[in-house]
Amino acid sequence: MAIFHLDFKIVKRSEGMTSVAKAAYHARTRITDDRIGETFDFSHRTDLHGHILLAPVSAPAHIVESSSALWNEVERVERQNNGQTARYFDVAIPVELNNDDKKKLVAEYCQKNFVDKGMIADIAFHDLDSKNPHAHVMLTLKTIGPDGFGKKDRSWNDKKIMIQWRESWATMS
């Protein structure tokens, strides 16, 4: 039986967070945050079962070539010292699915609910062979176009849309 877990949070500089550090942790990799000059290395972790970036077709290729490129650009274009740089969530994946279907389910959910609305989704799959298969997803807060990031879309902060996102996952999973 699937266990429902989906909780949205924000990466906030005012809380000492950086989207680059969060991305490095999720993707179990090593990324240097160009803004602060600090390197975050989680490559020793062994529970990663795949990683993908999903982006609108209008997103410039140089921004979506890697998590490092994406989140360093997000940090670069956020001008506020106490700014918010990403939305993120963890989602429990039904254990009954095979690993390919687990990945497909999360990717389809992210495409439908976020990427098709203009966000970039950075997805890391963890512990797919365990009793706790889950994905970590980071989402951009600003619109993306051929020229790069635009303004933040404040409608994405509406509690009603977050309820819709949760309902969508409950229906799809």
Feature roles, as predicted:
Residues 1-173:
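N-terminal nicking endonuclease/strand-transfer module with a His-rich metal-binding environment
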